[in-house]
Every structure is written in C-alpha cells, then in structure tokens.
Regions:
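Glycine-rich loops and low-complexity Gly/Arg-rich segments
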Residues: 40-46, 80-82, 110-111
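Hydrophobic beta-strand-centered segment that forms part of the acyl-chain substrate-binding groove
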Residues: 49-104
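Catalytic strand-loop segment that frames the active site of acyl-thioester-processing enzymes
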Residues: 1-55
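HotDog/MaoC-like acyl-thioester-processing domains
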Residues: 1-15, 90-111
Length: 111
C-alpha cells in the first residue's frame, strides 16, 4: 500500500475500485456484532414481507465497505474525516459491488 499525501490529491481524482461480493455469512456476522435483530437484515421471510426479494445489507455495512476502500487508498497515515454516501438501492448477499470514489472536495485541516 502506498501512502497518499494531500499534495498528491487533485479534485476529480478517482479512488478504487474495490470489488466485493458480500456473503450471507458476512451479513450474519455483521448484524451479530452490530447487535441488531431487525428482520429485513436477518430473515428472508420478513424481508419479503417488506417488499424485498430476501435479506438486505444494512446501510452502515455498505458504508463500511466504502470506508475500507478509502482507508486502503489513503494509506496508514491517512485520515478519513467525513464520508458522504447516497444510497441508490438495497444490497443483498451475493450482489457484486464495485466500490469507487471521486475526490469532490479537498480541505486541509490544522495548518
């Protein structure tokens, strides 16, 4: 992993990709650690009753994948201070995710 510094970053730079395919086992482990038992994340039956085709991943699990993308990109000394996310659809175990980002703002803090 290369270390990225603010001087190396320009508006419009691409980040990624990080390609993932979350599994049901990962979802079950995540919801267990998170401490939730919300049906749409744990039960196909409940998820279907809410209009989904099966269980879905919680938004914070999706955001964790994006955090993984960004912290892997910026290196050990990098700091992720804010992450803005637009959720466009639900994600289910087995979906192939192509996580990418675009630098839209640069703010130097502490100088």
């Amino acid at each position: 992993m290369n270390q990225i510094y603010i001087e190396d970053v320009d508006l419009g730079d691409d980040v990624g990709p990080l390609v993932l395919e979350p599994t049901r086992d990962q979802l079950d482990a995540f919801t267990k650690v998170w401490g939730t038992s919300v049906g749409r994340f744990t039960s196909d039956e409940v998820a279907k009753s809410e209009g989904f085709t099966g269980v879905i991943l919680p938004g914070n699990m999706s955001m964790a994948f994006l955090g993984q993308l960004l912290t892997g990109w910026c290196g050990y000394e990098g700091k992720l201070r804010r992450l803005d996310v637009d959720f466009r659809r639900s994600i289910q175990p087995g979906d192939k995710l192509n996580c990418t980002g675009i630098i839209t703002d640069i703010e130097v803090v502490g100088q």
